[in-house]
Amino acid sequence: MPKVPSLSVFFPEYNEEANVENMIREAQRILPEVAEKWEIIPVNDGSKDRTGEIIDRLAKADPNIHPVHHEKNKGYGGAVISGYNASKYDLVFFTDGDLQFDLREITLLIEKLDEGDLILGYRKNRRDAWNRKLNAFLWGSLVKLLFGFQVRDVDCAFKMIKRKVIDKVQLSAGGAMVSTELLARSSKAGFRFVEVGVTHLPRVAGTQTGAKLSVILRAFGELFKLYGKIKNQPK
């Protein structure tokens, strides 16, 4: 497979000292195989452990690593937005920093670039607890009802985005709703989606925060605000 000319990769990290070095090392191994130019943007979202220290140590040894640090925790959406806005190359890929995806499968998304503007992974066999699966099903059903676009896995953190999308679609959701906002605004703007099945792996270290009640309630509040903002917005 030919290499893409340039690729930015970012991933949020919050208290991921057990995963962050392996995540960055994996990106360092894979990106030179798929892109002529590339950058890694680890977004340290106000971690209280050694996550930021580890990121900075690795960045000192590799000029392709461009860290973003939040002094205070901004939430998942805030971290995604920081990586989204910091990216500089023609293609932008984001995933989570907890090693629950096989980064080698980025090639599956690259193969579909001619078919869409956003290449969206969906988890073929989601390896999460039942409550997270239930939350995802209910959330996805509500999103489809409100915004009308059909996507199998709205919140799958394995997405590739073309620069023209990033230049037009501005994000503001600070919480877990950021993927929904990206897709809703992109759909409204007329951009095309393509979906690709990807492998989902069990978390082996660190602690998930997405199923906390406070996170869920914030996401639902932001969802209805977004619906109110864009339902009558012209393309």
Each language-model region and where it sits:
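Cell-envelope/extracellular polymer assembly enzymes that use nucleotide-activated donors
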Residues: 6-8, 39, 181
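Short, well-formed alpha-helical segments that are part of the catalytic scaffolds
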Residues: 16-31
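Conserved donor nucleotide-binding strand/loop of the catalytic core
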Residues: 38-41, 52-86
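A conserved acidic beta->alpha catalytic loop
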Residues: 44-53, 99
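Catalytic donor-sugar/metal-binding loop of nucleotide-sugar-dependent glycosyltransferases
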Residues: 171-174, 184-201
